[in-house]
Design a protein with these regions (language model features):
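Pol beta-like nucleotidyltransferase catalytic core
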Residues: 1-207
C-alpha cells in the first residue's frame, strides 16, 4: 500500500524566511492569500547536465536541454537557477518560494518519469496557488483529474512547448482565472485526504 501510494510531499525552502512553511505547519497555508503580479517562472538548477548514472527514466538531461532552449527563446519567463546577462535569468535564490509565490504559472519538471512519483515540484505550486506547467508522473491524471495544471506530453518537442508557453503568456490572466478554481480543488483534497501526514495516520490507525 505504501509503495503504491503517490508521493505527496512538498518543500517550501529552509532558512529564516521559511517560517510557517514547516511540514507540520503546512495546513495554515489553506487560508493564506497569494497576490500574483508576475506571469511564468522556472526553478531548475543549471548543474543538471547529466543523468548522474540513473536509469533512462530520469529527466535531468532532457530537462536541462529544454530549459536551456527556453532561456534563449522565451524572455518573458523568469528562470531561477540560471545566471547570465539577460534580466530574466535570475540566478540562485535562497528560498524556493521566491520563485513561485508571485507567479501565476511555473514550469515543473520532475527528476524522473515514473508512476505515482509526484514531488514537491508540483505540490509547492499547488500550495501557493501557482498553476504548474507539468511533466513527470506517468499517471498523474489518475491521481489528479482536475484541470488545475497544464500537462505537457513531452519535453523534447521544443517548438510545441514554446507555442504553449507563448499562448499562456498572451492569455495569462484569463487562463489563471479559469484554472484557479480547479487548482483549489486539488489543494483542498490534498489537505483533507491526500497528504503524507494523513496517510501515515490512516496506516497507523489500522495497525
Amino acid at each position: 500500500e505504501v509503495i503504491e501510494t503517490p508521493s505527496l510531499m512538498f518543500y517550501g525552502g529552509r532558512g529564516p524566511q521559511s517560517e510557517g512553511w514547516e511540514f507540520w505547519n503546512f495546513k495554515n497555508l489553506t487560508s493564506k492569500e497569494f497576490k500574483k503580479n508576475k506571469k511564468i517562472s522556472s526553478i531548475v538548477s543549471k548543474l543538471g547536465k547529466n543523468n548522474h548514472g540513473y536509469p533512462n527514466e530520469c529527466l535531468y538531461i532532457d530537462r536541462y536541454n529544454l530549459i536551456y532552449r527556453l532561456s534563449e527563446n522565451c524572455n518573458f519567463i523568469d528562470f531561477f537557477g540560471w545566471e547570465g546577462d539577460k534580466p530574466n535569468l535570475k540566478g540562485f535564490i535562497n528560498e524556493k518560494k521566491e520563485g513561485i509565490v508571485d507567479y501565476k504559472f511555473s514550469i515543473c519538471i520532475e527528476n524522473s518519469n515514473e508512476k505515482n512519483y509526484i514531488s514537491e515540484k508540483f505540490y509547492d505550486c499547488i500550495l501557493t496557488d501557482t498553476i504548474p506547467i507539468y511533466f513527470g508522473c506517468k499517471n498523474i491524471k489518475e491521481i489528479w483529474s482536475y484541470n488545475g495544471y497544464i500537462l505537457l506530453d513531452s519535453i523534447t518537442d521544443y517548438q510545441k512547448i514554446e507555442d504553449i508557453l507563448n499562448y499562456i503568456h498572451t492569455n495569462c490572466d484569463y487562463l489563471y482565472d479559469v484554472m484557479l478554481p480547479e487548482l483549489k480543488k486539488i489543494k483542498e483534497e490534498y489537505f483533507n485526504k491526500n497528504n503524507l501526514l494523513k496517510k501515515i495516520n490512516d496506516i497507523a490507525g489500522n495497525i
